[in-house]
Design a protein with these regions (language model features):
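Short, acidic loop-to-helix structural element flanking the phosphoryl-transfer center
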Residues: 5-35
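Asp-based, Mg2+/Mn2+-dependent phosphohydrolase catalytic module
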Residues: 26, 35, 40-142
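Short, basic/glycine-rich phosphate-binding loops at helix/coil junctions
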Residues: 1-6, 61
């Protein structure tokens, strides 16, 4: 158990911002309600957000450990949707870098998907949007 605790602490200490992340968050925060939907250990995820001072941008943070289900399970998304005031699937976009959890979860939940794919990888998944740089979000959302 001590090893796991140390591993989670070190994992939580490893946080960095993707290019343009802060700039985009500052813009999106003014116009949209933003939420974090993430798998993982709550302590680790909160620590990462705190290290980068990002919590202030998000209305709520949904973490699999606290919910009891992981993305891409529909139960994870059902829980999130029930806890978002005036939730509207038609006005929802999941943005993520994982095909298996973020994009598949969005498909399962029947919400629009935006895959952040900086490495120009290929996929056969039917996604709404694919971006290679966070600045590309401006084109999608305007």
């Amino acid at each position: 158990m001590a090893f796991e605790d140390e591993y989670q602490k070190n994992l939580g200490d490893g946080a960095y911002l993707i290019e343009y992340a802060l700039e985009i968050l500052n813009e999106l925060y003014k116009e949209y309600d933003l939420y974090v939907v993430t798998n993982g250990v709550a302590r680790t995820q909160y620590n990462r957000l705190d290290l980068l001072d990002l919590r202030k941008y998000f209305k709520k943070i949904f973490i699999s450990e606290e919910i009891g289900y992981q993305k891409p399970k529909i139960e994870f998304f059902d829980f999130c949707f029930k806890h978002i005031k005036n939730f509207d699937k038609g006005k929802t976009l999941i943005i993520g870098d994982s095909l298996s959890s973020d994009m598949q979860g969005g498909i399962n939940a029947k919400i629009d998907t935006c895959w952040y794919n900086p490495d120009y990888l290929k996929t056969d998944m039917n996604l709404n949007y694919i971006i290679h740089n966070l600045k590309d979000l401006e084109k999608i959302l305007k």
